[in-house]
Amino acid sequence: MEPQRRELLAQCQQSLAQAMTEVEAVLGLLEAAGALSPGERRQLDEEAGGAKAELLLQLLLAKEQDHFQDLRAALEKTQPHLLPILYLNGVVGPPQSTEGAGSTYSVLSIMPSDSESSSSLSSVGTTGKAPSPPPLLTEQQANDTVENLSIQLRLMTRERNELRKRLAFATHGATFDKRPYHRLNPDYERLKIQCVRAMSDLQSLQNQHTNALKRCEEVAKETDFYHTLHSRLLSDQTQLKDDVDMLRRENGKLRRERNLLQQSWEDMKRLREEDQKEIGDLRAQQQQVLKHNGSSEILNKLYDTAMDKLEVVKKDYDALRKRYSEKVAMHNSDLSRLEQLGEENQRLQKQTEMLTQQRDTAIQLQHQCALSLRRFETIHHELSKATAQNKDLQWEMELLQSELTELRSKQVKTAKESEKYKEERDAVYSEYKLIMSERDQVISELDKLQTEVELAESKLKSSTSEKKAASEEMEALRQIKDTVTMDAGRANKEVEILRKQCKALCQELKEALQEADVAKCRRDWAFQERDKIVAERDSIRTLCDNLRRERDRAVSELAEALRSLDDTRKQKNDVSRELKELKEQMECQLEKEARFRQLMAHSSHDSAIDTDSMEWETEVVEFERETEDIDLKALGFDMAEGVNEPCFPGDCGIFVTKVDKGSIADGRLRVNDWLLRINDVDLINKDKKQAIKALLNGEGAINMVVRRRKSLGGKVVTPLHINLSGQKDSGISLENGVYAAAVVPGSPAAKEGSLAVGDRIVAINGIALDNKSLNECESLLRSCQDSLTLSLLKVFPQSSSWSGQNIFENIKDSDRMLSCRAHGPEVQAHNKRNLLQHNNSTQTDIFYTDRLEDRKELGHSGGSSSFLHKPFSGSSSPVSPQACPSTSERSLNSFRSDTSAERGYGLVDMRSQRPLLSFETEVGPCGAVEVPLDKIDPEGSNSGGTWPKAVLGSTSGPEKLSVYKKPKQRKSIFDPNTFKRPQTPPKIDYLLPGPGLTHSPQPSKRVGSLTPPKPPRRSDSIKFQHRLETSSESEATLVGSSPSTSPPSAPPPSMDPSEPTHASPPRKARVRIASSYHSEGDGDTSYLPAKKPCDEDLTSQKVDELGQKRRRPKSAPSFRPKISPVVIPAQCLEEQECVPAIGELSPEGQEWSPYSPGHASRHGNPLLYPNRPSVGTVPRSMTPGTTVGSILRNPIYTVRSHRVLPCGSPPVPRDAGSQSLSPSVQHQGRLSLDLSHRACSDYSEMRASQGSNSLPSSARLGSSSNLQFKAERIKIPLTPRYPRSVMGSDRGSLSHSECSTPPRSPLNIDTLSSCSQPQTTASTLPRIAVNPSSHGERRKDRPFVEEPRHVKVQKGSEPLGISIVSGEKGGVYVSKVTLGSIAHQAGLEYGDQLLEFNGINLRSATEQQARLIIGQQCDTITILAQYNPHIHQLNSHSRSSSHLDPAATPHSTLQGSSAGTPEHPSVIDPLMEQDEGPGTPPAKQSASSTRSVGDTTKKTPDPRIVFIKKSQLDLGVHLCGGNLHGVFVAEVEDDSPAKGPDGLVPGDLILEYGSLDMRSRTVEDVYVEMLKPKDSLRLKVQYRHEEFTRVKGLPGDSFYIRALYDRLAEVEPELSFKKDDILYVDDTLPQGVFGSWMAWQLDENAQKIQRGQIPSKYVMDQEFSRRLSMSEVKDDNTAKTLSAAARRSFFRRKHKHKRSGSKDGKDLLALDTFSNDSIPLFEDSVSLAYQRVQKVDCTSLRPVLLLGPLLDVVKEMLVNEAPGKFCRCPLEVMKASQQAIERGVKDCLFVDYKRRSGHFDVTTVASIKEITEKNRHCLLDIAPHAIERLHHMHIYPIVIFIRYKSAKHIKEQRDPVYLRDKVTQRHSKEQFETAQKIDQEYSRYFTGVVQGGALSSICTQILAMVSQEQSKVLWIPACPP
């Protein structure tokens, strides 16, 4: 920093640091200017407040470089009011506005004219604009000054007012003024004059100061400018010096080369003269020898010597040729250097222009700075300070002026030096031109020498060429003779074989003719039957509608009757309940008294034992004494202490406490057995020692009298080991609940007697305990005052005998494992010692059949509350004893009542107790699962399980203790219901299946609430049916189901969950099973949307057959874990009818029958309502690795996937983040690309039963089902030229590069189907590509042109997601940005020029260099990008070497596709990467270029919306135009509904029809759309009369098609053509006649030949469908007769996996019986007749790919024989990872690669482009599967296959130059087999086939074929409009 500036900054450092407020902004600007390093910035960030500003100034003072101007610029931008502090050292006051009172002068000038009070003058300068806030530095000074001025102003104002008053009195007369006049003080006058003078001086000083500041600022800016200019000129000077030195060196080098060339030319001239002399001598010698002696020996010697000399000359020639090629290469390099120098000159000129622009901007900034400095005027009241500051400024200005003069002198010197350098450069250029002219002369002389050498060489070779030609002819004749003999033998054999085949074929032809006659007869019969069926169908439909209405009315009446019946039953249940309560209480009392009397009769019973809690039984146990010395350990059991230490409090009996497994006592004694007598020794009131003594004293056998408790259904903890056998899922689900832990004796609950320990509490006072904690439940209990109503889930006994052995042993085992068995009663301990064990987290709600009718209002039960529990007395760990039911105990009649006494009311607060452990339950007859303790939830509150066998209910009304028990009642019909799972409330609504328990062998005993039927709505016509397979890979699938139409039937209504549900009586009507998919949300139920009324006539029989016959393949993979929201539109509901079921339902599963255990074990599909949430066992397919419902696996599209969706279901990209419903599950079970959706054909089959208006007989079109499966059954060979065509294979293909919008479904039609609005539903099917931008759309946040910006990208291992191309003059541009990639997120745009990449300059880099740099692995990337799309567009257009014919893409053929360049959408470079992407700008419509507008100044009317109510099939509107100019309304009939003031008028351009865009549709498409029956229409039209007048009467369509069949014209106007002919269609609705097109036949050069009439696509599709169906009729045995089933199913389906009702298939729709809603509208529907194509004229040479044997030899021969035409594609060696190479292939950088040892040989796109730009055919060395990848890159190679007859033929190939070695037998066989495999798999890609033979013959054929194909027009599949 300069000393003056350093001193100035040091003086104002403190004041500036205190006044600086926006420090962060200043730091940012300084860092951007380079004044602060990153380390200094971090150091500053650590400081805070004023310390940061002080540290900043200290750092700037400490720096050697001068950053004063950077600081000044930063302050000027952020805090301009601080600049005076910087220059005036803090003497300035606050900046004032120009209009405010900022000085004393201004204060005096605005004094009030009237007599204000002194208080109003206290605020000086308040009038006018308010001054800006003063800086902190001068605030005190300003305040003092203002106070002084205010005092003076008060005095002056008072005196002025006095003078004014006196003046007023004086003017009106002296008589009024009686007051004495006081003369003014002379001192005041003097002071006033001095003040005015001082103010004027101050004002002049201020003006001078302002001018000085302005001049200083200007000088500072000029100084900075000249500094920068000087540095740039110095750099340019050094660069020019380097260039001059380089040119000098090159000049010297060229001179040396010129000298060498001249010397070599002289040597060659001398050698030529010597050779001529020598040749003359030789000729003379030869003549002499011939004259003297004509012996042959001498001639041979002369010949040999001549040949030797010829060889020497040839070698010399080769050396000269090599030198000449080197010189040519050097010349080329010199030319490139010259071009680089020219570019450098242009760059310098651009820099000069930029400097001029910068100067202009500096002047503008200077003007702005002057304006900004006016705000910095401050109040300076002290004249001395102002004068001192002015002197300082003058001194500084002088310094700056001196610097300015120095800089100007330097500038003059620099200008002189630059002129000098320019002169030197001009001299170098002139010298260079001279050198180039001399070089041209040398080259011309060399050419002359070369011609002379060639003449000499031709003369020398003339003698040998004749000999070689003779030998070659002889060899060729020999080969021809051998081949002719071999071919003759083969031909004879083939003739014999063909003769036999001809005879057989003649016989087959006769039989086929006979069969055709029979088939014609059958067809006629079938058509007649079809007409009858159509009539019957219509009558049946009307009858079904009447029956449906009657059924609805009957069901509504039935529902009312059921409600009244439920009320009656409710009253009856209340009475019967009270009666049963009294009866049970009396029975219990009688049983208690009986037991009491029985126990009192025994003297051994202790009176302290509670006789009401249990029953006892006595048993005699006998042990065999094996030895005399025996103890308790040998017997295997242990006893309690008895009297001394009782096992139970208050009970002194001796109890068995332990029984060892496998011991003698095992099986005889049980834990808790009471030992009464051992060997006749009474143990009453005895201790353990006495018992042991009695045991050991016995001799022989040991007899023990044991009293044990009878089983009341207690729960036993039973260890159980389950072998999972490799499966991850045990099949057990858990759930929490609220249970009664204890009942306090004497409490109201104990007195009531119905509440027992272990009962689950479902609801308290009608409040369901779902998702409630234990504290909340207890607060509900405490809040009850007068009465309490509980809804309980009772635990009922399951066995009559209780096996309670080894309880304590099980407690010990439970420390290691926790398992459970299905539900047993709970055990109560003796004398009020309740053994409360862990209640199972899954209970079974078992009701007796008479109580099933009593339960009426059972709602959803919750299971999310905590367990109430009580630990086992005397045990450290709680247990859950439960018994495993036997198979014989599964009947309902085997249940016994739980007669537990001493039941009291009151739930014990167990918060202080140990938490209860939750158990997994879902076990089989003998199964439980082993669960480690460490995996059990210690809180026991959120296990997240389900209730697989329990269907609970909560009463919605106050029903007191609504669960009762009574043994052995009659059976009843169960109506299971489901409840939502409360433990897993998700964030979104999910689809979950109902409880499917068919995989459990244990009988499902389910009782739920019976809901009465409600009048069904139209939305109930389709339900879901849920089935599960028993396989381990079972999954849930949606199946459409319809309620039975056979009365009496109560279809499940859609009920509001807020409405109370009522019990329904058992009914004998058989109800069809369905399942409900519910939302697992916060207790809310998502509703299924209603269907249209027209969809109700899908009969239940057909749907049931769908459910029975269709099975999902077991090989289908699991679903994804994502689960779809339950928002299911009617479209998906309707289409789900066609989805195959996973598991096949048993016959019993179709209807309800009286309950039996066996029946329940066979099927577990309950009747569920669509609005009721369900809870069931979650099968393995429901784990997080799977999903359910209608979530369908979408096809995975890779680069090589080109599949057409015949039914139009579009695929979904994989990076899609949302799940959508799909109308088919076809893709669930496969990852192949067979996208033919079965749902579409099934749907059309069902829809065919609905009668609707159809087209006239001449316009009947094939149904969508026929269109769907005919692609594989029409026996038309499909051999398109290019595999990207739609019919390129038997499966079809779809080009991603050319068709960015997915095919639309033919079902997507606004007719009777609810699929008509896919864009308005929540399940709109996703598309392949993002919707393209409109014509004028541009991103608002796009960067400015020519504004470099830094882009930071956190890359990591992910690809960058961009494609790049090189510019014409260097540079790298972004040609594509992938949506969602890291580059897209970072802000890279299409058209960005990459200036730098991680600091590496890419401004002049080539594309290949940039790819290598960008491909480097790094975590963080910094890119300097500049948005400049225009240069890229010009470059890309100039490099484009092929174009589309405009007629092939008329009026936005590429509309909707984002491929192509921004300006010319029809330009396609076959070697450029043009893949559609969101970063690529949208293609502009070419309508503006093809449609001429007459008067541009005339305003076009705005589009309008027209609504038409369509009352008839024909709309009465005539159309004209087409996709070329648009479809216009030609005429509107008088009786048309479109007629009217708000209707259509002639000249209207149809823009939209409904929701469909008609701008690029053909007139036939619009006509077909208008024929479809609709109630109301919505059209968007625009009146364009002038265009209509031009279009009217002219063909308006324009597109190319490829014929896929042969046609012979029968009448004159028809057109004949052959398969693969290209036709140009110009009218799709000639003269308003539907069914034919007018087309031109084109030749190979796309020239029109003949125009004629051809059948339309719809007519041909109908014809093909009819032929297809007729060809399917076959006889299984003799083809003579058909079975009855075959006759019934005359028209058979194609797909074998579809539903078939009989062995031979079921009825298919008759081909002519279709409605208009099955007509496919769009062009992207698969057609077997025509294929839309577009023309590409390739101006550049296409690459050539050779396939077959001996490729290397053929390529080498082609390159050597025709070097100007062919060049092999070089393989680049890359040492990178496999992932990097594959990423390059994915990004279209590499075409193919081969793995070598340690590296990869890669074929790049850049190398192909480089060879093509040299005007040569590139011989590719890639695998056949990469052909499709080339097509994606718009590279269309010529694929030629070399076909040999056999491996022996390959082995026999010879060539003296290219194939010297013999091909081995093994090698030839391998090559032949490989060639055969390629021929089978990739024959559709072959452009031509060359028959194998001699290598020269093969090369000749290849040359001819390549020339022919290059001259042809290339036709590629066109994008659908």
UniProtKB/Swiss-Prot annotation:
The modification Phosphoserine is found at residues 264, 295, 900, 1000, 1021, 1209, 1263, 1334, 1669. The modification Phosphothreonine is found at residues 984, 1011, 1183. Residues 1045-1055 have a biased composition (Pro residues). Residues 116-143, 857-898, 930-1121, 1204-1227, 1243-1266, 1280-1343, 1434-1501 are annotated as: Disordered. Residues 1017-1030 have a biased composition (Basic and acidic residues). PROSITE patterns: CARD, GUANYLATE_KINASE_2, PDZ, SH3. It is a peripheral membrane protein. InterPro entries: CARD (IPR001315), DEATH-like_dom_sf (IPR011029), DLG5_N (IPR006907), DLG5_SH3 (IPR035537), GK/Ca_channel_bsu (IPR008145), Guanylate_kin-like_dom (IPR008144), MAGUK_Signaling_Regulators (IPR053004), P-loop_NTPase (IPR027417). Residues 1252-1266 have a biased composition (Low complexity). Keywords: Cell junction, Cell membrane, Cell projection, Coiled coil, Cytoplasm, Cytoskeleton, Membrane, Phosphoprotein, SH3 domain, Synapse. GO terms for cellular component: adherens junction; cell junction; ciliary basal body; cytoplasm; glutamatergic synapse; plasma membrane; postsynaptic density. Residues 620-710, 705-796, 1350-1429, 1504-1585 form the PDZ domain. It comes from the Eukaryota. It is found in: Cell junction; Cell membrane; Postsynaptic density; Cytoplasm, Cytoskeleton, Cilium basal body. Residues 1724-1907 form the Guanylate kinase-like domain. Pfam families: dbPDZ_assoc (PF16610), Guanylate_kin (PF00625), PDZ (PF00595), Takusan (PF04822). Residues 1-90 form the CARD domain. Its main location: other. Residues 139-601 form a coiled coil. One of its GO terms (biological process) is negative regulation of hippo signaling. Acts as a regulator of the Hippo signaling pathway. Negatively regulates the Hippo signaling pathway by mediating the interaction of MARK3 with STK3/4, bringing them together to promote MARK3-dependent hyperphosphorylation and inactivation of STK3 kinase activity toward LATS1. Positively regulates the Hippo signaling by mediating the interaction of SCRIB with STK4/MST1 and LATS1 which is important for the activation of the Hippo signaling pathway. The guanylate kinase-like domain interacts with the SH3 domain. This is Disks large homolog 5. It comes from Mus musculus (Mouse).
